[in-house]
């Protein structure tokens, strides 16, 4: 994959990535569309729901790793579908076995099936256990700055606050909480859930997020591969805008042309 690595590259758990767009692998019509969309996104980290996706646990079924090989992508197993800390920890341990000792994992412990909001009590409990077990934990959480800091202090490798409910496409609903999380953090902050279109991804990056993870926004689009390409450009543009620094907002106009030396 031709992904430019610069001094501004994303670093997670000691590994450097040229792309700040992380993608999911669910909801695509088939494995070929998954492959094409992942390539169009330029993603280097792809997340996989261990309880829903075959990565070797079912030998007779199509294997996602045949189209997204671990030699090319960092596979990020996640605990989607888990509602208790115990289930999440068990799922991570299974993933580590299937991926030959791979320790990077995405933790999510959900509160209920309607909202898919994280159960923060169970999330904290699972995060503490997984860190003790030697996992590098990227954790899905609410946009609560206090909780985000606590997860960082536990030892999580990245904190992943939601922008809006999973799959909602509502975009960033509370940018001020995200800003506080970003300002206080010493680990990467990656927006996870709620992105609907390219402008949402760009806004997240303009705020100073280190990356964006998405699945439904790409897989649910009319043309997923084209949307993946759009998201790639949005993340890159948003990051460059953040680094460049936006102009201050003003209530009144400010002429862009100099007034000195006017003719007449």
Swiss-Prot record:
Catalytic activity, EC: 2.8.1.10
Record Pfam families: ThiG
GO biological process, one term: thiamine diphosphate biosynthetic process
Residues at the catalytic site: 106 (schiff-base intermediate with dxp)
Keywords, in A-Z order: Cytoplasm, Schiff base, Thiamine biosynthesis, Transferase
Residue numbers binding 1-deoxy-D-xylulose 5-phosphate: 167, 193-194, 215-216
Coiled-coil annotated spans: none
SUPFAM superfamilies named among the record's database cross-references: ThiG-like
Pathway: Cofactor biosynthesis; thiamine diphosphate biosynthesis
Subcellular compartments: Cytoplasm
InterPro entries given in the database record: Aldolase_TIM, Thiazole_synthase_ThiG, ThiG
Primary location: cytoplasm
Record carries keyword Cytoplasm: yes
Enzyme class per UniProt: transferase
GO MF annotation terms: thiazole synthase activity
Record bears the keyword Cytoplasm: yes
Oligomeric form and interacting partners: Homotetramer. Forms heterodimers with either ThiH or ThiS.
Described function: Catalyzes the rearrangement of 1-deoxy-D-xylulose 5-phosphate (DXP) to produce the thiazole phosphate moiety of thiamine. Sulfur is provided by the thiocarboxylate moiety of the carrier protein ThiS. In vitro, sulfur can be provided by H(2)S.
Protein name, entry field: Thiazole synthase
Organism: Stenotrophomonas maltophilia (strain K279a)
Primary gene name: thiG
């Amino acid at each position: 994959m031709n992904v430019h690595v610069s001094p501004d590259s994303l670093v997670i758990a000691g590994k450097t990535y040229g792309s700040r767009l992380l993608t999911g692998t669910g909801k695509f019509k088939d494995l070929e569309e998954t492959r094409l969309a992942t390539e169009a996104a330029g993603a280097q980290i792809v997340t996989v729901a261990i309880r829903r996706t075959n990565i070797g646990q079912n030998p007779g079924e199509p294997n996602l790793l045949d189209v997204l090989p671990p030699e090319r992508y960092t596979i990020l197993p996640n605990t989607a579908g888990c509602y208790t800390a115990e289930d999440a920890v068990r799922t991570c341990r299974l993933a580590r076995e299937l991926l030959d000792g791979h320790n990077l994992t995405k933790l999510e412990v959900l509160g209920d099936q309607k909202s898919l909001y994280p159960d923060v009590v169970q999330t904290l409990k699972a995060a503490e256990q997984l860190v003790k077990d030697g996992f590098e934990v990227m954790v899905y959480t609410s946009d609560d700055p206090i909780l985000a800091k606590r997860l960082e202090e536990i030892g999580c490798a990245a904190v992943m606050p939601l922008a809006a409910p999973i799959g909602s496409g509502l975009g960033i609903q509370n940018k001020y909480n995200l800003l506080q999380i970003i300002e206080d953090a010493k680990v990467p902050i990656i927006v996870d859930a709620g992105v609907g279109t390219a402008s949402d991804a760009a806004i997240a990056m303009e705020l100073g997020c280190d990356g964006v993870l998405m699945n439904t926004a790409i897989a649910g689009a009319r043309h997923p591969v084209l949307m993946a390409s759009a998201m790639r450009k949005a993340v890159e543009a948003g990051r460059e805008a953040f680094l460049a620094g936006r102009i201050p907002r003003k209530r009144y106009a400010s002429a862009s042309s100099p007034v000195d030396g006017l003719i007449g």
